[in-house]
């Protein structure tokens, strides 16, 4: 696969291969047939990063071939959203003509939304001065005149310059409601917005008859917490990254949701708090014992859940587990299978044309 050509004719085959692979991995745990959620065959990725190559008077985006490590010039990138593709061309044309903006520019990061907003970060191997800021403002205004709803950011060593602000707001149609999600530059967001909608709607569906409260670990900007709030009395969610916590708090207010509480701590710290091993000032004013959490939601990093967190989640009647790495999910299921059974399984094709799989399982306590 080259950056400018996607093997769209092979989309169905690669999806069928992933489905078979996931089903085989889950068969030792008596999993039901997987529900399959497709991605758009192209223009599905809402963010992209490119190195910038200087060749005398020319300047262009590049990527590196994963096998040969050779650089590849990138004019169009069908993996990324149409909005990013449009901006790539317009932005590079403008920068190419301005020496102050192109000098020691080595990378450009793009973030886009289904709501039509864009954020571009220009990364430099040099200090950014007032002259750079003036030219960057002119560039931003020029691109806005071309119809781009754009935020522009400059980065250099220990420097971050925001011309306006460092976020854009996404609006996702989720199970009959428009959900607003603030997305902060350089913070995690789901890369495939269409598949993210599938994940949110599946999570809502599998918990529609849930009772009590929901506990979520690793909540990020509140992506799942806010969508799932409609199915629960209250939601208690943890997140460690400050920008994500701030975005989550904004999203709670923007969506007029009054039953979600975000606390800034790691899953490991929360486990210690629940077990009474440590006390945390961050939990002052929050009575953990008042929550009747019958469902726990986890969307861990690729490494999966650590042993202590596995023990923590086993205490809950229902576990909703979204995994970006089925191998570590299976490792966790080796322990979870003794207390819970898989009642729903889903494959989300978040990363088409790669071996990566995103999946979800609903686990329910054995009788």
Swiss-Prot record:
GO terms for biological process: tRNA methylation. GO terms for molecular function: rRNA binding; tRNA (uracil(54)-C5)-methyltransferase activity, S-adenosyl methionine-dependent; tRNA binding. The keyword Nuclease does not apply. Keywords: Methyltransferase, S-adenosyl-L-methionine, Transferase, tRNA processing. CDD domains: AdoMet_MTases (cd02440). It catalyses: uridine(54) in tRNA + S-adenosyl-L-methionine = 5-methyluridine(54) in tRNA + S-adenosyl-L-homocysteine + H(+); uridine(341) in tmRNA + S-adenosyl-L-methionine = 5-methyluridine(341) in tmRNA + S-adenosyl-L-homocysteine + H(+). InterPro entries: MeTrfase_TrmA_AS, MeTrfase_TrmA_CS, SAM-dependent_MTases_sf, TrmA_MeTrfase, U5_MeTrfase_fam. The keyword rRNA-binding does not apply. SUPFAM superfamilies: S-adenosyl-L-methionine-dependent methyltransferases (SSF53335). One of its GO terms (cellular component) is cytosol. Pfam families: tRNA_U5-meth_tr. Belongs to the class I-like SAM-binding methyltransferase superfamily. RNA M5U methyltransferase family. TrmA subfamily. This is tRNA/tmRNA (uracil-C(5))-methyltransferase. The lineage of its organism: Bacteria, Pseudomonadati, Pseudomonadota, Gammaproteobacteria, Enterobacterales. The gene is trmA.
């Amino acid at each position: 696969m080259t950056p400018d050509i996607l093997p769209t004719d092979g989309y169905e085959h690669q999806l069928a291969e992933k489905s078979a692979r996931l089903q085989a991995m889950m068969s030792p745990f008596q999993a039901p047939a997987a529900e399959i959620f497709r991605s758009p065959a192209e223009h599905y990725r809402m963010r992209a990063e490119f190195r910038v190559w200087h060749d005398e008077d020319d300047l262009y985006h590049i990527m590196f071939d994963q096998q040969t490590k050779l650089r590849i010039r990138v004019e169009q990138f069908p993996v990324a959203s149409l909005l990013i593709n449009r901006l790539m061309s317009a932005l590079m044309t403008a920068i190419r003509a301005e020496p102050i903006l192109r000098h020691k520019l080595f990378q450009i990061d793009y973030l886009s939304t289904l709501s039509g907003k864009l954020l571009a970060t220009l990364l430099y191997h040099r200090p950014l001065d007032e002259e750079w800021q003036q030219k960057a403002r002119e560039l931003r205004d020029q691109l806005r005149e071309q119809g781009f709803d754009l935020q522009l950011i400059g980065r250099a060593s220990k420097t971050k310059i925001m011309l306006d602000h460092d976020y854009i707001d996404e609006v996702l149609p989720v199970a009959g409601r428009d959900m607003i999600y603030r997305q902060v530059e350089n913070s995690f967001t789901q890369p495939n917005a269409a598949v993210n909608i599938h994940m949110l709607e599946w999570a809502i569906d599998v918990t529609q008859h849930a009772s009590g409260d929901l506990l979520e670990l690793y909540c990020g900007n509140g992506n799942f917490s806010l969508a799932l709030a409609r199915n629960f009395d209250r939601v208690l969610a943890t997140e460690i990254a400050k920008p994500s916590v701030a975005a989550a708090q904004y999203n709670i207010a923007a969506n007029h949701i009054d039953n979600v509480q975000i606390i800034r701590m790691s899953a490991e710290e929360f486990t210690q708090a629940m077990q009474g091993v440590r006390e945390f000032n961050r939990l002052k004013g929050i009575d953990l014992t008042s929550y009747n959490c019958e469902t726990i939601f986890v969307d861990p990093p690729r490494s999966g859940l650590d042993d202590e967190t596995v023990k923590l989640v086993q205490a809950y009647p229902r576990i909703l587990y979204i995994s970006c790495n089925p191998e570590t999910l299976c490792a966790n299921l080796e322990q979870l299978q003794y207390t819970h059974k898989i009642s729903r399984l889903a494959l989300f094709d978040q990363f088409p044309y790669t071996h990566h799989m995103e999946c979800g399982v609903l686990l329910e306590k054995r009788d």
